[in-house]
Amino acid sequence: KPQDDVIISPQSVQVKGASGDLQISPDGAVIRNGQALSLNDSQRQKAFSYQSALRKQLPWIDDGAQKHLEKARAALDKVIVKELGSNSNVRNRLTTLNGQLKQQMNRIIEHRSDGLTFHHKAIDQVEQDGRNIVQQSMGGVLQDSLNEMGVKQAANSGGNPLQAIMGNLGGLQKAIQNEWNNQEQDFQNFGHDVCNRVTALETQRKDLLKALK
């Protein structure tokens, strides 16, 4: 797991934490713990490549996470419209959940007016909070689904309404579960991709620190 915070701005990329305090300008100049370092070509090239990689990868990770959340919302929304109709309140719940999860993401990769800040210590807390938010939201989804099916059933009442509701709810749960599994697989693939990129960045960071000794 990353051990540093990263602060990206037009003037520099700052890496703070296990690495001490490194500031790298877009041309590869380095200030370490407040001291400007005099670098040879190879050191400057490593510093330049590392800050370029951070400038590229952090927005890629942030953008990818936002897109995956939106894709999951749209896919689940389709299931809800099909099963409960376009007026279902569950659709609002999904939109709210999407917004809440994006806010959680912003605790890890914070958007500033002049760039991004990556907070490495927020990762574990956000994982936990995110899980709680999803669980609470799913409880609300279930409650709304029951209510809405009850209303629907009362309108078409014939036979045993409770049995019909439970049957419909089983169908809805299955449809949501199937779609959720699809999206989860997608998220996992994205997660692996992120891990590979973070590992590559860590390798670059270590190489740079070794070169600066």
Range-by-range predicted roles:
Residues 67, 74, 81, 103, ...:
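Heptad-repeat coiled-coil alpha-helices
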Residues 1-98:
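N-terminal Sec/ER secretory leader and immediately downstream segment
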Residues 88-185:
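Extended amphipathic alpha-helical interaction segments
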Residues 85-88, 150, 206, 213:
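Glycine-centered secondary-structure boundary/capping sites
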Residues 1-17, 160, 192, 196, ...:
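Charged/polar interaction segments and conserved charged motifs
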Residues 163-213:
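A cross-kingdom marker for long, charged
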Residues 38-42, 46, 118, 161, ...:
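General structural signal for secondary-structure boundaries
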